[in-house]
Amino acid sequence: MEPLLSFKSVSKQYDDMQILDKIDIDIESGYFYTLLGPSGCGKTTILKLIAGFEEADNGDIIYQGKSINHLSANKRKVNTVFQDYALFPHLNVYDNIAFGLKLKKLAKSEIKRKVHEALKLVKLEGYESRTIEGISGGQKQRIAIARAIVNEPEILLLDESLSALDLKLRTEMQYELREIQSRLGITFIFVTHDQEEALALSDYIFVMKDGKIQQFGTPIDIYDEPVNRFVADFIGESNIVEGKMVKDYLVNIYGQDFECVDMGIPEQKKVEIVIRPEDISLIDAKSGLFEVTVDSMLFRGVHYEINCIDRKGYEWMIHSTKKAEVGSKVGLYFDPEAIHIMVPGETEEEFDKRIESYEEQDNA
């Protein structure tokens, strides 16, 4: 099946700064995608290229099988929800949503029907005559979405569009966005630097750094099997330690062998090991895989964040529902499945092949 939208080796430069470096992406119809990465990684530039606000320096942007490199923004079946919403303060809610429809010179009855449907979808029926100054931040967000979807775009772009909301409202809007996307069935492409937001909202995530795609996959794939240290650090909390692959299903960490589920990596190959804090249990010091000293503890609401130091001076973070006394000796335990092996220098393609070989082995 042909992708709805593709970037083929797309590059973009501002002055002497390389913003996008030979980007390749495929976007299928009807899914929620997120471009995730730190400030300056190029994610908003991708949105601008899709919307037609910028042109690529090199490469091709393909929409439904045709190049749209030089297609003007107003001819693209794309709408954008901006970070500041970009609502017209001198127009009421109805006229804000109807603005694009009036430019198309639709009949008044058709405009009224479409505006009503859009307001119903974002759960703001009856707000037609409200002023923009008289509604809350969350309501402005919904009006901006209604104004975008009323034009029936194939793709909806959202540029950091939840960042101005407080935590509670942002969480509520995450549910709203997922529901709206599911009901409309159109493609959403969302930009954020917030990894929790990306994990909660997305069908698929592109993790970006320095103008390049570091990893693409489902939230679970990226969280459970990060391709490199950057992705492991950026997506959630991680314990990352160095080690060597002894043989298939056995890795050495700090001179001690541990069972794992990885295979196909050369013996004695230097690797990096990721163990998530929630996958580690605190037990009696003598019963653990190794002993650590509790260095600090913070209460995070649903769990305690406990930092420990092992005998070699390395720090370990554990998320536990149990308290631990600072200064006490405890044991750490984790299952072989909790160990995720990363091979330094491994490309995403090589990484994907390795992970696929595990699945083939499991199904054999």
From Swiss-Prot:
Catalytic activity of the protein: ATP + H2O + polyamine-[polyamine-binding protein]Side 1 = ADP + phosphate + polyamineSide 2 + [polyamine-binding protein]Side 1
InterPro entries found in the cross-reference section: AAA+_ATPase (IPR003593), ABC_SmlMolc_Importer (IPR050093), ABC_transporter-like_ATP-bd (IPR003439), ABC_transporter-like_CS (IPR017871), Mo/tungstate-bd_C_term_dom (IPR008995), P-loop_NTPase (IPR027417), PotA_ATP-bd (IPR017879), Transp-assoc_OB_typ2 (IPR013611)
Residues annotated as binding ATP: 37-44
Localization (cell): Cell membrane
Species the sequence originates in: Staphylococcus saprophyticus subsp. saprophyticus (strain ATCC 15305 / DSM 20229 / NCIMB 8711 / NCTC 7292 / S-41)
Superkingdom of this protein's organism: Bacteria
Protein's name according to its UniProt entry: Spermidine/putrescine import ATP-binding protein PotA
Subunit-structure text: The complex is composed of two ATP-binding proteins (PotA), two transmembrane proteins (PotB and PotC) and a solute-binding protein (PotD).
